[in-house]
Amino acid sequence: MGSPWNGSDGPEGAREPPWPALPPCDERRCSPFPLGALVPVTAVCLCLFVVGVSGNVVTVMLIGRYRDMRTTTNLYLGSMAVSDLLILLGLPFDLYRLWRSRPWVFGPLLCRLSLYVGEGCTYATLLHMTALSVERYLAICRPLRARVLVTRRRVRALIAVLWAVALLSAGPFLFLVGVEQDPGISVVPGLNGTARIASSPLASSPPLWLSRAPPPSPPSGPETAEAAALFSRECRPSPAQLGALRVMLWVTTAYFFLPFLCLSILYGLIGRELWSSRRPLRGPAASGRERGHRQTVRVLLVVVLAFIICWLPFHVGRIIYINTEDSRMMYFSQYFNIVALQLFYLSASINPILYNLISKKYRAAAFKLLLARKSRPRGFHRSRDTAGEVAGDTGGDTVGYTETSANVKTMG
């Protein structure tokens, strides 16, 4: 297979690429990674896709179907499950790019949407976690204020605002990427109405962070020059938008680290409040409320820690990716990012597993939903206060619920 890196039809002749030669593209594969890396990564990602989609669908169905589960905290978690589902929908496109960075066959719209939806849902998840942590802080450290501020209607409105802010913040990504033809391949009109492939000298020195895939090889066989040029089309940032893309990637990084700082402060204050309140409580209602608070914080802390562990490498990899020009660091960045990609999709798949492991109420509701039992699982009784809210969950203590030690139940 020919390659613009070693072609001799350019006006300046062939020049060596700025990093070691990569295997050429063919009809089956166009990737800088060997099969020994692609196969296990693909297997892991497909497992995450199946587990994540099924788990998040169950979470959304539980919160939508059972009124006991429709609480302020669980409304956030249900919205986060929708965000995770949308993130997981981008996994097949990332797998396609791992195996075949070019040609991109899904059109410019899906090229733009695959990045935009992933970024927008990432922002939405971060904003949801921050808002949920603020609610928990108010419920535990400022309970009187929480009784006034936190209601289901306001939480639903806030969730809509969070989604709007997230999607608007990610809006520039719609214009920063597109289906680009490799600069090293162009169709040049020839004599007698013929056409030929021309190799541009610009192909020898593209920005290293723009495209890590191997140089394209035109399809073998009697394809035309136009078909060979089409083979080089790739979903990637536009060269004219590289500066703006760098800015947006730093915005994305700030979107991660600023909420992380906020979460650290909030959970530090919550932990101090819960620790200082570890004293004998009067009556079963106070004892049940305290256990509900602790269970809620325990679940949310596990979710937040899993989120940080899974997403931190992703953002560190991006920082390395957009700042390195050294070929050895480039190879390190490639393999670091392929691991970070798996952790990124793990974060979108793991929350339902955590809910199932930690929350008895979630397990009971999921068991009832999946087996379609007619009888209500144990503990699924309701009590209402004057506002008509359902008591007994992680969010119930924020709106003036009447709780007892028997009906304090948590989902997460």
Curated annotation (Swiss-Prot):
Membrane topology per record: Multi-pass membrane protein
Main location: membrane
PROSITE patterns assigned: G_PROTEIN_RECEP_F1_1, G_PROTEIN_RECEP_F1_2
Compartments, record wording: Cell membrane
Tissue: Expressed only in thyroid, stomach, and bone marrow.
PANTHER family linked: G-PROTEIN COUPLED RECEPTOR, MOTILIN RECEPTOR
Protein's name in the database: Motilin receptor
Organism of origin: Homo sapiens
Phylogenetic lineage: Eukaryota, Metazoa, Chordata, Craniata, Vertebrata
Gene name in the database record: MLNR
